[in-house]
């Protein structure tokens, strides 16, 4: 299991000359979903830590990338392969990914807390994927970012059919609307047809709103700050997204 995830993560990072531990951890979670699917519910933080360590400390497979060398720039610790000297653009790319990753990882526990509160009264289990159960109805929630959800959309569409219940991707708010507009333009119809739901948590306000899709248990609607958000997005953004062409 660990080996498969490490190998998938190594493929994702192939060609990279500099990374951070934060980026590796964030992408390890994505790869774990791809390999494990709904089984991710039963996995704790130790698996992701083991996968992360494989790439920067002690490889657990010959197919694992190994970013064995460290260099600290400012407050950020970068890793790169032995005998490879990263260039300026390599560090710039790694720093961009670091900022994206740190923002997500810092918001992760808050996102889970907000989602738990939304599903108050449901039994909850899992860390990187949460399963909420009540009266025979299941909701599976995976935590990601809207940009990563865009890249992994095929995996998320597959998950809708794999789980025995509803599948929701929980993402944090962004500083700009463009990532959401991009996803809506490209994949909103596919998501709606499949039944994929995407809800947005504001980590600062600790609120949650629907972006695409609603829960089948309409008693849950009261948990959204703005229950009409997904309907408003669907109505107004069909015109707005043409601006991206």
UniProtKB/Swiss-Prot annotation:
Pfam families: DUF6834_C, DUF6846. CDD domains: Af2093-like. Signal peptide: none annotated. It comes from the Archaea. This is Uncharacterized protein AF_2093.
């Amino acid at each position: 299991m660990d080996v498969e995830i490490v190998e998938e993560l190594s493929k994702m990072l192939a060609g990279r000359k500099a990374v951070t531990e934060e980026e590796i951890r964030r992408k390890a979670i994505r790869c774990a979903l791809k390999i494990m699917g709904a089984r991710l519910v039963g996995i704790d933080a130790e698996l992701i830590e083991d996968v992360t360590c494989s790439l920067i400390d002690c490889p657990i497979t010959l197919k694992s990338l190994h970013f064995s060398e460290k260099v600290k720039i400012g407050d950020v610790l970068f890793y790169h392969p032995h005998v490879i000297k990263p260039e300026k653009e390599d560090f710039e790319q790694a720093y961009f990914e670091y900022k994206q990753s740190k923002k997500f990882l810092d918001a992760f526990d808050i996102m889970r807390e907000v989602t738990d509160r939304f599903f108050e009264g449901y039994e909850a289990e899992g860390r990187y994927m949460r399963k909420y159960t009540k009266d025979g109805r299941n909701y599976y929630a995976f935590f990601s970012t809207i940009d990563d959800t865009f890249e992994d959309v095929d995996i998320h569409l597959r998950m809708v059919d794999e789980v025995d219940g509803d599948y929701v991707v929980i993402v944090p708010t962004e500083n700009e609307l463009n990532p959401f507009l991009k996803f809506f333009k490209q994949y909103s119809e596919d998501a709606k047809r499949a039944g994929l739901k995407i809800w947005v948590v504001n980590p600062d306000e600790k609120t949650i709103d629907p972006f695409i899709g609603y829960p089948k248990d309409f008693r849950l609607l009261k948990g959204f700050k703005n229950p009409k958000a997904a309907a408003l997005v669907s109505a107004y953004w069909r015109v707005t997204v043409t601006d991206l062409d």
